[in-house]
């Protein structure tokens, strides 16, 4: 049961997220924040959250794409549940255990807010969508920081800690960037959006977001190998 929640569920949820988002990209009708006539999904021009729009920027109903994207968000709740079981793997060291508990305290609401990203499509609830997105990243940043410390005090190699520290720095910088960024609604404030942001700026932000998300997914997978070793260490 411990390996099921602490290793298997994390891997299954991550794999499902990747598959569901890939399907959502394939089924996305088209349009981005600047080019409304774009056909299909562009990896470097569309944000991931656009997959959850009720209507795309091109004005098309986005039912199928949003269905798979939202299901990927909901699966993150399983990761939140999994992290309830993880702190006990660090119980051999009181510092590791304490820091992992703090990490879990932050990562569970982070997963809930990531679900909120799907529940607040940006084309309908722009301000709520921005709030859930920034809050999710902020909470996740703090959680990764404490889990990095937990791995440092654990009997495992600091390889796992170093990876999470690098992610903490990357996500932390991105969260700081989002905090200082003044988002403009590309639908209701379209003229202001087009006069403020260029295509190069859009592409930069889209690619940065995808890099951060990719690092987050890789870190979870790397964590599972470290957690699996902790399970074997306790036997």
Regions flagged by a language model, labelled:
Residues 78-109, 234-235:
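Cytoplasmic juxtamembrane regions at transmembrane-helix boundaries
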Residues 55-89:
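Individual transmembrane alpha-helix segments
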Residues 88-91, 116-124, 176-184:
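Juxtamembrane "helix-exit" motif on the non-cytosolic side of transmembrane helices
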Residues 4-33:
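N-terminal signal-anchor transmembrane alpha helix
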Residues 106-156:
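Membrane-proximal helix-loop-helix units in multi-pass membrane proteins
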Residues 144-235:
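Terminal transmembrane helical module of multi-pass membrane proteins
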Residues 14-18, 72-82, 138-147, 211-226:
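Hydrophobic cores of alpha-helical transmembrane segments in multi-pass inner/ER membrane proteins
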Residues 33-61:
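Extracytosolic (periplasmic/ER-lumenal) interhelical loops and adjacent juxtamembrane/interface segments
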């Amino acid at each position: 049961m411990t390996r099921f929640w602490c290793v298997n569920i994390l891997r299954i949820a991550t794999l499902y997220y990747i598959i569901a988002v890939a399907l959502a990209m394939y089924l996305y009708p088209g349009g981005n924040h600047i080019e409304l006539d774009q056909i299909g999904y562009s990896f470097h021009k569309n944000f991931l959250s656009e997959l959850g729009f009720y209507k795309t920027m091109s004005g098309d109903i986005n039912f199928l794409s949003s269905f798979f994207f939202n299901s990927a968000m909901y699966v993150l709740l399983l990761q939140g549940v999994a992290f309830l079981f993880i702190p006990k793997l660090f119980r051999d060291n009181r510092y590791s255990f304490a820091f992992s508990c703090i990490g879990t305290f932050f990562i569970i609401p982070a997963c809930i807010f990531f679900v909120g990203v799907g529940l607040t499509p940006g084309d309908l609830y722009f301000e709520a969508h921005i709030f859930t997105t920034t809050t999710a990243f902020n909470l996740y940043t703090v959680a990764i920081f404490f889990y990095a410390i937990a791995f440092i005090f654990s009997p495992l190699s600091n390889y796992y800690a170093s990876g999470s520290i690098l992610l903490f720095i990357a996500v932390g910088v991105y969260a700081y960037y989002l905090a200082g960024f003044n988002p403009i609604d590309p639908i209701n404030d379209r003229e202001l959006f087009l006069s403020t942001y260029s295509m190069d700026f859009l592409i930069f932000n889209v690619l940065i977001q995808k890099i951060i998300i990719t690092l987050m997914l890789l870190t979870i997978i790397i964590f599972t190998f470290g957690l699996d070793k902790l399970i074997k260490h306790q036997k």
